[in-house]
Amino acid sequence: MRLCDRDIIKWLDEGKLVIAPRPPIERINGATADVRLGNQFRVFCGHTAAYIDLSGPKDEVSAALDRVMSDEIILPDDEVFFLHPGELALAVTLESVTLPDDLVGWLDGRSSLARLGLMVHVTAHRIDPGWHGQIVLEFYNSGKLPLALRPGMVIGALSFEPLSGSADRPYNRRQDAKYKNQQGAVSSRIDED
C-alpha cells in the first residue's frame, strides 16, 4: 500500500524519509511528492560506432561507453536544455532522496509532459530501499517537436511503498551498488556488472 500525502509528510517530519530540498506542502498531493529538474545533463555524442557489445569484455564496454557519452553538461539556471525528437539524454532531479531500509520509491513522469512525447524514465523507475542520492532521469522525446526543459521545472512525482519489513540487503549496504550516493547525471555503469 502506497503512502498517502499525509503519511509522506509524516515520514518527512520524522526524518525516516528525506527529500532535500524538501518539497513545499503544495507539491505533496494524493500519493506523491513532486520532484524538479536539476541542471546536469549528458547526451550521446556524435559517433560512428555501429553498436556497443554490452556482453563483451568489461574494458571494451567501458571504452565504448566513454566514446559515445558526453561529459556532464551543467546549465546555468536561466538556460534551457533542448531535447529533440528521437533523442535520448540523461538528466538528474534537483532533489536528493534518502529512503530507509523498509521503504521503496517509484518515479513517475508527469502526464502533461507525456502528452507532448516526453518520457522521463525509459524503464528504471524503482528507487531501492536504502537509496541515497539524486535520481537520474532517462529522457526520451517521442514527440514531433523539440522540447525546451528548464532546470527547476516540475518533472515528475515520487510515490512510496512500505515493505513488509526491512530489506536484508538495502542499496546503501550492497557491495555491488554501482550508483551509491549518486550525484549528477551519472552515465551507465553496465561495464561494472
From Swiss-Prot:
GO terms for biological process: dUMP biosynthetic process; dUTP biosynthetic process; nucleobase-containing small molecule interconversion. InterPro entries: dCTP_deaminase, dUTPase-like_sf, dUTPase_trimeric. Keywords: Hydrolase, Nucleotide metabolism, Nucleotide-binding. The keyword Kinase does not apply. This is dCTP deaminase. It comes from Photorhabdus laumondii subsp. laumondii (strain DSM 15139 / CIP 105565 / TT01) (Photorhabdus luminescens subsp. laumondii). Pathway: Pyrimidine metabolism; dUMP biosynthesis; dUMP from dCTP (dUTP route): step 1/2. Pfam families: DCD (PF22769). HAMAP family: dCTP_deaminase.
